[in-house]
Amino acid sequence: MNSNPLSNLDDEGRSKIDRMFNGCEEIVGIGHVANVISGSSSHSGGNQLNAYIGLEPSGKAHLGWMVLAETIDNLLAEKVNVTVLLADWHAWVNDKFSRDMEKISLAADYMSEVFRVLLNFPEEGDGPGQLRFIRASEMMDSGKYWERVLR
């Protein structure tokens, strides 16, 4: 049995993965990505690849944001839908901005605007190659969220 998840991909599929993860040291779920590129269903049931990145709004932009933006840009270019979770409740739990949710919310606004600029204002939405920002507080306000947590 071959343990290399990329072994079943053709050259085009391997090139796509190389472009998506250029510069990345570790890729979690590469087997799933390779399977979807090969035609299998994604976790959501279709053929759309989705990436989720959770970030705590906790301060000013720094060099690391540019590195992350480059990877996000690579994913968007390969038609991956990228969701950036602005983990505002995590910032609150971790005592950022003295647990002032108004300041944390302002930091989340700042963070999303900086990433829009770094990514040259990509199209936003739920489709292929689109970017979406969502706050943990928005998700937690959803009845679906709590239904899932309590099950």
Model-derived regions: residue spans:
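Non-catalytic terminal extensions that flank enzyme cores
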Residues: 1-58, 126
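Structured alpha-helical segments in the cores of large, soluble enzyme domains
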Residues: 30-36, 73-80, 108-112
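Structural preference for beta-strand elements that scaffold enzyme active sites
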Residues: 50, 81-83, 132
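Histidine-anchored nucleotide/phosphate-binding helix
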Residues: 63-84
